[in-house]
């Protein structure tokens, strides 16, 4: 907070340059909590005994540190140490450490810094060589890095931001905020930080430690999660020295244990309506709760999905939602998932009586849930993936008990459907405690399993129309193309995925054939548009008489546009406009005025703005507010679906 920041930088203050300066208004909470209630004895500060001066502050009702559970100072508090990659200590004096780190960063070294919620990997954001070294070591070839600025003034001196972005950057949550790079006039190595993108993820210091770091460095710094690509953020010294020793040249450690590590949260605002979209809900936002919600006397736990895992728990009259955990394919993430289940059970001193999971039989969350059912002897229910998405936004807006029917538009990359196919372009109708599927994008072939999500050109191959032979031959060698075409002839698994449709369009337009990180093709497509005029847009498809959407028409018409030399930006605008108008065609046909949106596709800021602009006069639109539209909301949706539709 501002008061602690002033003390931190005041030479005569007893907490001068003490990076763990906190009060009742600021400092870590969830990261250091072992059990409830939040009292010092229940946190990792229990072994740090307050000195007489800190104790006086703690017991003085007139002091802002009255009952501050994280209270400490240089005399009784947390110690820093700077070491090299071998573990050899270099410095331990606080002021000297930050000056040394600043010098190392300016020299091009990578520093692993243990912050209040886990390790960050930091380097000079103006040094292309250092950035590329970090990419190589972290095995992160293209995915953008977040940039830490010393102050709002420093950021605004380099690039313009909106009032909504400024408010979020200065909020207590202090997330990474994605901003446009248009008009950027600083010294960042833009192409190295965000390859192919015209946006930056920026944040401001949210701890005393980062405040002191930036005071000494003074120039922007890369600040990315301390992990190897795909694994969870690291939070203890032993793991950092073993797993990150090949990444960082030096380490800044401290001796406060972290129980619940958290990544930085990520948000974006749509350019026209400044609607907030949460991309990753973690530090600052999570865990959070909904309630009181007198749903049930049962204790209910929802295990979420497989990607962007979260857990929801209803142990009393409140629903608690965990932070983003990651993708369960990774061994360390799966361990954190199981640990979080155990943590929730211990914290609330309550074992679930009902377990909920996704219908996909291969999801590790579902498989683990079935083991827990046998172990705990509890009730088991599975909830279809896209119905969970729909239920998440319904629950956030308290729509289950209203009499007005709601159209659910759920678009994402993948989800196991009730018919055994891969859904992802779904329309549902909710009315009087019933949720039914009323439409979807036409099915097309699901090729090569999960590989399809990594290679947009496979989506194009599946949706290819007449005349594309030369284009496909330019993307595949002849042997590979023959193999895939043979697979298509024998394939029985279909998909309605809009996420994969985005991939197909990106490949068709020559934007991306292979994703190096999740959603890369769609993100690169969005970067081609900063503004649009609805009056200049045209649609590439209309809904069929049966209520399905002719996916192939969209691809065929875009291919024709490419042949006519229509600019890429115009085609992308038309594509997004097509998607938006199709939704309102369905709504008119169904005579529905209330529309709820969820699924990862609705992280596209331009699409969200188009929907709000087209629907502003005649429709009431609902989006996920306090949680991401992506699979982070599956656990919340599972629980909302159960208490409102299954239990009822």
Regions found by a protein language model. Give the residues of each.
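Acidic, glycine-enriched active-site microenvironments
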Residues: 1-648
């Amino acid at each position: 907070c501002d008061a602690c920041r002033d003390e931190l930088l005041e030479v005569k203050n007893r907490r001068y340059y003490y990076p763990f300066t906190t009060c009742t208004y600021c400092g870590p909470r969830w990261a250091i909590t072992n059990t409830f209630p939040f009292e010092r004895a229940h946190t990792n500060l229990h072994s740090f005994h307050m000195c007489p001066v800190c104790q006086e502050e703690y017991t003085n009702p007139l002091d802002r540190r009255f009952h501050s559970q994280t209270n400490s100072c240089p005399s009784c508090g947390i110690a820093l140490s700077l070491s090299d990659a071998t573990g050899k200590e270099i410095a331990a004096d606080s002021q000297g450490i930050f000056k040394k780190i600043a010098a190392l960063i300016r020299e091009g070294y990578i520093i692993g810094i243990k912050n209040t919620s886990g390790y960050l990997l930091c380097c000079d954001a103006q040094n292309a060589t250092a950035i590329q070294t970090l990419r190589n070591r972290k095995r992160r070839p293209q995915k953008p890095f977040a940039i830490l600025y010393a102050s709002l003034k420093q950021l605004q001196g380099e690039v313009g931001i909106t009032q909504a972005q400024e408010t979020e950057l200065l909020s207590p949550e202090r997330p990474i905020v994605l901003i446009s790079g248009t008009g950027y006039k600083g010294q960042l190595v833009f192409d190295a930080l965000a390859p192919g993108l015209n946006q930056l993820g920026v944040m401001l210091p949210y701890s005393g430690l980062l405040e002191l770091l930036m005071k000494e460095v003074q120039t922007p710094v890369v600040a990315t999660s301390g992990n190897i690509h795909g694994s969870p953020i690291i939070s203890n010294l032993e793991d950092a020295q073993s797993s990150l020793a090949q990444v960082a040249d030096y380490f800044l450690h401290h001796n406060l244990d972290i129980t619940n590590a958290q990544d930085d949260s990520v948000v974006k605002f749509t350019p026209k309506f400044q609607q907030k979209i949460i991309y990753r809900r973690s530090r600052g936002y999570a865990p959070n709760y909904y309630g009181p919600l007198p749903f049930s006397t049962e204790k209910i736990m929802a295990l979420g999905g497989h990607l962007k895992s979260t857990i929801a728990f209803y142990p009393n009259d409140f629903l608690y939602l965990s932070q983003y955990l990651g993708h369960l394919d990774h061994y360390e993430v799966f361990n954190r998932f199981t640990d979080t289940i155990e943590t929730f059970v211990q914290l609330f001193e309550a074992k679930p009586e009902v377990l909920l999971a996704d219908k996909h039989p291969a999801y590790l969350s579902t498989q683990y849930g079935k083991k827990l059912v046998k172990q705990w002897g509890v009730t088991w229910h599975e909830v279809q993936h896209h119905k969970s998405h729909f239920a998440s936004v319904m629950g956030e807006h308290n729509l289950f008990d209203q009499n007005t029917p709601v159209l659910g538009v759920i678009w994402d990359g993948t989800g196991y459907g009730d018919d055994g196919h891969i859904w992802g372009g779904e329309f549902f109708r909710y009315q009087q405690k019933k949720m039914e599927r009323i439409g979807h994008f036409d099915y097309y072939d699901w090729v090569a399993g999960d590989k399809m999500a990594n290679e947009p050109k496979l989506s194009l191959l599946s949706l290819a129309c007449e005349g594309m032979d030369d284009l496909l031959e330019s993307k595949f060698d002849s042997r590979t193309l023959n193999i895939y075409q043979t697979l298509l002839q024998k394939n029985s698994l279909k998909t309605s995925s809009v996420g994969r449709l985005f991939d197909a369009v990106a490949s068709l337009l020559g934007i991306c054939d292979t994703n190096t990180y999740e959603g890369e093709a769609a993100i690169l497509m969005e970067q081609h548009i900063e503004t649009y005029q609805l009056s200049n847009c045209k649609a590439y498809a209309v809904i069929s008489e049966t209520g399905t959407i002719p996916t192939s028409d969209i691809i065929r018409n875009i291919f024709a546009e490419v042949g006519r030399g229509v600019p890429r930006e115009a085609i992308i605008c038309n594509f997004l406009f097509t998607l938006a108008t199709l939704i309102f065609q369905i709504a008119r046909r169904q005579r529905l005025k209330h529309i709820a949106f969820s699924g990862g596709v609705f992280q596209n800021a331009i699409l969200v703005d188009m929907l709000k602009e087209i629907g502003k006069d005649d429709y009431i639109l609902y989006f996920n507010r306090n949680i991401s539209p992506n699979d982070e909301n599956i656990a919340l949706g599972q629980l909302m679906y159960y208490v409102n539709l299954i239990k009822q």
